[in-house]
Amino acid sequence: MNKKMTEQEGIRHQKIEELKKLKTEPFGKNFTCSHTIENIILNYQNIDQEWFEENKVNVKIAGRIILKRGQGKAGFLHLQDFNFKIQVYLRSDLLGDAFLLYQNCDLGDIVGIKGFLFKTKTKELTIKALDFIHLTKSLKPLPDKFHGLQNREEMRKKRYLDLMVNEKSRQVFLTRSLIIKSIRNFFDNEGFLEVETPILQPSLGGASAKPFITSHNALNSDFYLRIATELPLKKLIVGGMPKVYEIGRIFRNEGMDATHNPEFSTIEAYQAYSDIQGMMELTQKCLQYICQTVLKSLEINYQNKKISFQTFQKISMTDAIKKETGIDFQKKLSQETCLQLAKQHDINVMSHFSQGHIIEVFFEKYVEHKLIQPTFIYGHPLEISPLAKKNLNNPRFTDRFELFIAGKEFVNAFSELNDPIEQEKRFLNQLKQKELGDDEACEMDYDFLDALSYGMPPTGGLGMGIDRIVMLLTDTPNIRDVILFPHFKNKNIIKKK
């Protein structure tokens, strides 16, 4: 703990000794509440004072002091639990010696109150205190509600303070919990089985991403933190589980911006005997369920944009590009022609780029940011979809879709490739891509190929980013504001030379 104290912190430290003189433990013990502040507000807020005069409601609550006013023999406190606050009225003649504890308390202290409910002349629901129990001394003053913690980075680093003083943040994380609960309820109700698969993986697969690498001492081997849950979940489909899903953390050792964080949460789900169409229907149904459950509406506002989940649009990737640029990539163009088109449109072509990669970059540059309403983009090039089935009508493309909302990707799904011979060829091509400089290419996963060799039924699968769903439904523009503890460079760690 930093030994340099402010004047206020020094005074608070002195009060520890004052509490001990009053035979009060500064950091308290257990305290059993009869109600939460939320219970009291929701159940008694709209009741008149006349009712309280005829019906005495005794309460025993605990909370953090966020306001203190009054002098002499009476005063008021505002106590706050996570999301609700209530006024407390305290008088020396009712509290006796406990009134000294009230007089010595500071903002931020955690206390218990025993008393009964009444309404003030201004009709504010209030507890008249009969006992004041000190529970925890706060050794640092709370940030000023209006002037403190204005720096966004500081709020993210000290989320505990942000939650104390910022109602918006509290609502975001309550909503996040509701969203995850609604996702779980949806898939449970659809007959999916929730499973858990390893975070540490011996091989890299299931997505195109740079991994975090760690060492397993007991096995004397390097492992990856998973970049997706796809391959182990599909092994469970091979094993006979017809519908599975997993909600969990994914790790990708890549850049950070307003919509990307290296550690993030996803839901992945796989259904035997389904396909791309089944996944589209499941995705739309799931998002509509989440919106209705959490917001009670299919219409939302996100960053001054009105978005409706009533209907979902659908367009192929090549048609979307043609609409914006006039270029028809559905036609079979030569690599030289594609490279020339990329040059004409100021698209940087990397050494490993195939036609499929060029098509993807055209989409990202000219189409993606314009997809505001929920839109399924389907028909991705084969080269960028190593785990998806080829489209039967045009094998240059796959039965894959991504869902875009507000200009960002939210869902990735496809008819899963279940041909082990074709999958091995795709993995070999990924290795060639890696040799050409694609550090996000998949590795060869022999155990997954072995599983496919026993036969995986035709399967549909989807992956959805939970953090982005939370951003969307809470009207939050930065992913770091929907993650409780985002990462920061630790300036206190001294690196070994």
Swiss-Prot record:
Its EC number is 6.1.1.6. The keyword Aminoacyl-tRNA synthetase applies. Binds 3 Mg(2+) ions per subunit. One of its GO terms (biological process) is lysyl-tRNA aminoacylation. One of its GO terms (cellular component) is cytosol. It is found in: Cytoplasm. CDD domains: LysRS_core, LysRS_N. Its main location: cytoplasm. Keywords: Aminoacyl-tRNA synthetase, ATP-binding, Cytoplasm, Ligase, Magnesium, Metal-binding, Nucleotide-binding, Protein biosynthesis. It comes from the Bacteria. Its cofactor is Mg(2+). InterPro entries: Aa-tRNA-synt_II, aa-tRNA-synth_II, aa-tRNA-synth_II/BPL/LPL, Lys-tRNA-ligase_II, Lys-tRNA-ligase_II_N, Lys-tRNA-synth_II_C, NA-bd_OB-fold, NA-bd_OB_tRNA. It is an enzyme of class 6 (ligase). Belongs to the class-II aminoacyl-tRNA synthetase family. Homodimer. This is Lysine--tRNA ligase. It comes from Phytoplasma australiense. The lineage of its organism: Bacteria, Bacillati, Mycoplasmatota, Mollicutes, Acholeplasmatales.
